């Protein structure tokens, strides 16, 4: 896998897996909305009332409707523990 996709794939996969609604802005300014059905190296399949195949080279920004955690345990450096929430 190319080093440039080490962030892209886990991020898109988390959006797909959790069915998080997204806004996708294209380089020409058009805004598309929906859920990521699937993706590969070149395209994202966006599902709304219809399915749209969007070429990644035409995408400027992907904005999730809510925060998404896309880092798995294997993404952390060895020996690093996940952050624990502390009560105040």
From Swiss-Prot:
- Which GO annotations describe the biological process of this protein? regulation of DNA-templated transcription; regulation of RNA stability; regulation of translation, ncRNA-mediated
Extract the PROSITE patterns matched here: SM
Pfam annotation, one family? Hfq
Q: Keyword annotations for this protein?
A: RNA-binding, Stress response
State the signal peptide span: none
Indicate the quaternary assembly.
Homohexamer.
- Which protein family is it in? Belongs to the Hfq family.
Protein name listed in UniProt: RNA-binding protein Hfq
């Amino acid at each position: 896998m190319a080093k440039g996709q080490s962030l892209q794939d886990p991020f898109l996969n988390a959006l797909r897996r959790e069915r998080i609604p997204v806004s996708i802005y294209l380089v020409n300014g058009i805004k598309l909305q929906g859920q990521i059905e699937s993706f590969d190296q070149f395209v994202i399949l966006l599902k709304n009332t219809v399915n749209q195949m969007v070429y990644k080279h035409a995408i400027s920004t992907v904005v999730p409707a809510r925060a998404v955690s896309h880092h798995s345990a294997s993404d952390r450096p060895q020996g690093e523990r996940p952050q624990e929430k502390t009560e105040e």
